[in-house]
């Protein structure tokens, strides 16, 4: 007796899990057995195929955001991008560990994204791909950022790794395409720097796909009116990207280097600010109680000045020094503050200067590219704007050097102050003072007096911030993210070079000299530099974006479904680019007779070329239980579908008359049978693309498909959504409650247990069986059985015709065609 599963076992369950939070998005890695999920709690999760084991989770936070709207993998599978609606941010995350490698803000919440890789080959591109990046030879490797500061700086703090190279990935151009509300569409080279802003498209983007040959961009949008949505398909020409691909690749590579370096400089400044605030907090914590409890009207500065001049401390100051601070505590505090000062100094020397010099190098190379007007002027690259950006970077380097001099001066004063105070406290305790510590020159006294003047000057404007009683204004004023002038700018009196420049009108206006802003902070000059660089690199994005012209507009259908917007994230339509045949495919459903019928629209990526069978609808007829020779016939509605690979579509169907728990099917639909060259002339769309397709259902050719393998009944699960991965040969099915996940290996057959009498059935079941496009009637089957057996007896099997619940007992032989 044959024991058989409930359907032909083409797919094997390899993992199943009930998740605590509702899943709103899931997408397989293009290269690994990993699947990324986003849930309603704002978490991004990474799971492995084996038992659906969780690898890591990226929790929501204030910096990035809490409302994830979509996910996309970089084509090499090493980076994951996700969009956040509440902060309007895009975050790039390393697959190895949770953490933001790079993030940037966009103008509108992103509703969909697509990350593609260019597959076009040419001799110019090949030489560029193979050429070693000269910047690796000419520029020193950027120092890693210290790990003991904020988590935002950890992306550049990994030992023995180059995070910028990890961000940039392979030299081959890849583009992250973002779509959002109000026709918002932007293209980011290497997922980092904007190279195009598309205009002229109305509505909210539901899906988009940039072809791998860079010839066209497909977009599906919806425009809501009177409680319903009009869904339309657009195809835009992107010939400028295609025609200037080598130039776009070189330019984009430079853009992303510049973008990563700006982030590196920002993070270096963040670390410097944290080191500065650490000094303030440590001193403030010691002085606050003293100021609150002292009975005298003198200031902290006066108390220390009195001790310096007369060698005698007031009772309040002596209590502060001996009871709250102590000699041991002073020594520890001095070491800690000196360490913070040294950290700021080191960050300026090794990080700010290195990053700025690298930035200067890449901008200079970009200026060289812009000088080749024949190649780069059509892309909007402007040499004059880049020259202005180079000048702004030079000003930033000058300001960083100025800060370095201020830090060096403050360090001298700081060391002199703590040495003097240490000796004073030893005398108060009548401890022995070493002779070398007891010596104090007039210069040392001047340093101490300067330290007291600079750092203990109570500033009312600081009372609501850190540094109320102790401020490091000479250093801190450079790190404040404000537009105010410096409180104590550097003294330029007697500086012969400065005086010479001020008196020479020719040199003041010379493009060879970087402008100097003596009264502005480092943060101000940095912001100015960023704005100028952004403006300089914004022009190519505008030029390329305006070149993308709408070539095709096809109204698809009117959607009146009142579903939760979160659940719509999974819904049709679904776009796919076949890189081999250069075709755009669009999967969508049309409501007909209360059923959702799947339609496939395909267009050539080259707008000037046409394709046969451009629109076809699929009707699912019957499913054969090959091991029991039974047929499942019913009425099926398409719930979800995605491309598994270039040749196959994975579909989730609902049996509208099946009983609960046995009414969902997972199906693999080969496109080779949908687009059969032998009868393609019979399946031509006879309507017009200028009218909504759901109003022309009768004009859409419908092919009825009947399956004998590559399908499975999804028992005990209200399957609703599917995500397939042809590279790893897996699919993930999600239930309608968005919590129940089941993972299948799609190309592995389950083993069956057979008794001795089942040899014949086993042999028949192992024969390759094709998917039928047409079920024969009983009379046709009887007439053709003998002839078919004579011609090819191995492809004739017996099939029982049953109702949807398999109750009929009539049987007939059936020829598989």
From Swiss-Prot:
GO cellular component, as recorded: anaphase-promoting complex; nuclear periphery; nucleus
Glycyl lysine isopeptide (Lys-Gly) (interchain with G-Cter in SUMO2) crosslink residues: 772, 798
Pathway entry: Protein modification; protein ubiquitination
InterPro entries listed in its UniProt record: APC4, Apc4-like_WD40_dom, APC4_C, APC4_long_dom, APC4_metazoa, WD40/YVTN_repeat-like_dom_sf, WD40_repeat_dom_sf
Keyword Lyase listed: no
Keywords: Cell cycle, Cell division, Isopeptide bond, Mitosis, Nucleus, Phosphoprotein, Ubl conjugation, Ubl conjugation pathway
Domain of life: Eukaryota
Compartments (UniProt record): Nucleus
Subunit structure as annotated in this protein's UniProt entry: The mammalian APC/C is composed at least of 14 distinct subunits ANAPC1, ANAPC2, CDC27/APC3, ANAPC4, ANAPC5, CDC16/APC6, ANAPC7, CDC23/APC8, ANAPC10, ANAPC11, CDC26/APC12, ANAPC13, ANAPC15 and ANAPC16 that assemble into a complex of at least 19 chains with a combined molecular mass of around 1.2 MDa; APC/C interacts with FZR1 and FBXO5. In the context of the APC/C complex, directly interacts with UBE2S.
Function: Component of the anaphase promoting complex/cyclosome (APC/C), a cell cycle-regulated E3 ubiquitin ligase that controls progression through mitosis and the G1 phase of the cell cycle. The APC/C complex acts by mediating ubiquitination and subsequent degradation of target proteins: it mainly mediates the formation of 'Lys-11'-linked polyubiquitin chains and, to a lower extent, the formation of 'Lys-48'- and 'Lys-63'-linked polyubiquitin chains. The APC/C complex catalyzes assembly of branched 'Lys-11'-/'Lys-48'-linked branched ubiquitin chains on target proteins.
Family assignment from sequence similarity: Belongs to the APC4 family.
This protein's name: Anaphase-promoting complex subunit 4
Designated gene of the protein: ANAPC4
């Amino acid at each position: 007796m044959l024991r058989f599963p409930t359907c032909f076992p083409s797919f094997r369950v390899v993992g199943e899990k009930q998740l605590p939070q509702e899943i709103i998005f899931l997408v397989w890695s293009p290269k690994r057995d990993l699947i990324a999920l986003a849930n309603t709690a704002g978490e991004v999760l990474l799971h492995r195929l084996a038992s659906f084991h969780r690898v890591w989770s990226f929790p929501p936070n204030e910096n990035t955001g809490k409302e994830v709207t979509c996910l996309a993998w970089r084509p090499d599978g090493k980076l994951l991008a996700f969009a956040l609606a509440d902060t309007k941010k895009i975050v790039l995350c390393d697959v190895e560990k949770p953490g933001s490698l790079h993030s940037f803000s966009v103008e509108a919440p992103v509703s969909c994204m697509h990350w593609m890789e260019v597959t076009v080959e040419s001799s110019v591109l090949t030489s560029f791909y193979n050429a070693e990046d000269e910047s690796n030879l000419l520029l020193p490797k950027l120092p890693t950022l210290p790990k003991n500061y904020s988590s935002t700086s950890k992306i550049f703090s990994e030992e023995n790794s180059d995070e910028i190279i990890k961000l940039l990935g392979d030299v081959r151009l890849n583009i992250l395409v973002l779509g959002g509300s109000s026709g918002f569409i932007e293209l980011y080279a290497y997922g980092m720097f904007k190279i195009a802003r598309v205009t002229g498209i109305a509505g909210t983007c539901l899906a988009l796909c940039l072809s791998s040959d860079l010839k066209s961009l497909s977009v599906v949008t919806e425009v809501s009116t009177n409680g319903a949505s009009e869904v339309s398909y657009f195809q835009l020409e992107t010939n400028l990207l295609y025609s200037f691909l080598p130039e776009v690749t070189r330019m984009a590579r430079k853009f992303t280097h510049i973008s990563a370096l700006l982030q590196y400089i920002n993070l270096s400044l963040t670390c410097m600010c944290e080191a500065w605030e650490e000094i303030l907090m440590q001193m403030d914590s010691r002085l606050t109680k003293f100021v609150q409890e002292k009975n005298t009207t003198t200031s902290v500065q006066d108390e220390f000045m009195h001790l310096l001049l007369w060698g005698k401390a007031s009772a309040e100051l002596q209590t502060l020094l001996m009871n709250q601070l102590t000699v041991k505590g002073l020594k520890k505090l001095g070491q800690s503050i000196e360490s913070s000062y040294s950290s700021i100094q080191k960050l300026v020397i090794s990080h700010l200067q290195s990053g700025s010099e690298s930035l200067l190098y890449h901008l200079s190379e970009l200026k060289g590219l812009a000088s080749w007007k024949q190649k780069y002027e059509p892309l909007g690259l402007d040499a004059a704007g880049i020259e202005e950006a180079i000048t702004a970077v030079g000003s930033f380097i000058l300001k960083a050097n100025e800060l370095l001099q201020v830090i060096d001066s403050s360090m001298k004063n700081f060391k002199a102050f703590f040495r003097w105070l240490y000796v004073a406290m030893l005398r108060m305790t009548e401890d022995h003072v070493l002779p070398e510590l007891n010596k104090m020159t007039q210069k040392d006294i001047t340093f101490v007096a300067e330290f007291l003047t600079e750092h203990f000057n109570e500033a009312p404007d600081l009372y609501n911030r850190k540094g109320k009683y102790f401020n490091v204004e000479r250093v801190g004023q450079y790190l404040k993210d404000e537009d105010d002038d410096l409180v104590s700018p550097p003294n330029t009196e007697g500086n012969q070079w400065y005086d010479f420049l001020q008196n020479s009108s020719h040199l003041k206006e010379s493009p060879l000299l970087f402008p100097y802003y003596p009264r502005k902070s480092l943060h101000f000059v940095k912001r100015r530099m960023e704005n100028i660089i952004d403006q300089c690199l914004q022009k190519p994005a505008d030029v390329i974006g305006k070149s993308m012209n709408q070539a095709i507009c096809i109204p698809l259908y009117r959607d009146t479904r009142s579903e939760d917007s979160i659940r719509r994230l999974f819904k049709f339509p679904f776009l796919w680019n076949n890189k081999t045949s250069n075709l755009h495919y669009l999967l969508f459903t049309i409501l007909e007779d209360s059923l959702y019928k799947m339609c496939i629209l395909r267009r050539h990526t080259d707008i000037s070329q046409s394709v046969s069978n451009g629109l076809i609808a699929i009707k699912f007829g019957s499913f054969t239980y090959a091991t029991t020779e039974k047929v499942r016939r019913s009425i099926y509605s398409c719930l979800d579908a995605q491309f598994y690979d270039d040749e196959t579509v994975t579909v989730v169907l609902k049996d509208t008359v099946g009983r609960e728990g046995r009414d969902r099917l997972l199906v693999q639909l080969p496109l080779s049978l949908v687009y059969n060259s032998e009868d393609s002339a019979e399946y031509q769309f006879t309507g017009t693309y200028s009218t909504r397709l759901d109003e022309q259902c009768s004009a859409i050719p419908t092919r009825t498909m009947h399956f004998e393998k590559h399908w499975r009944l999804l028992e005990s699960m209200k399957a609703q959504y599917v995500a397939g991965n042809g590279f790893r040969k897996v699919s993930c099915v999600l239930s309608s409650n968005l919590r129940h996940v089941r993972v299948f290996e799609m190309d592995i057959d389950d083993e069956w247990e057979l008794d001795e009498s089942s040899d014949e059935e086993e042999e028949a079941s192992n024969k390759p069986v094709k998917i039928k496009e047409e079920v024969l009637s009983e009379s046709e089957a009887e007439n053709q059985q003998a002839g078919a057996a004579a011609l090819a007896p191995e492809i004739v099997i017996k099939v029982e015709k049953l109702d949807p619940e398999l109750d009929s007992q009539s049987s007939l032989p059936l020829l598989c065609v």
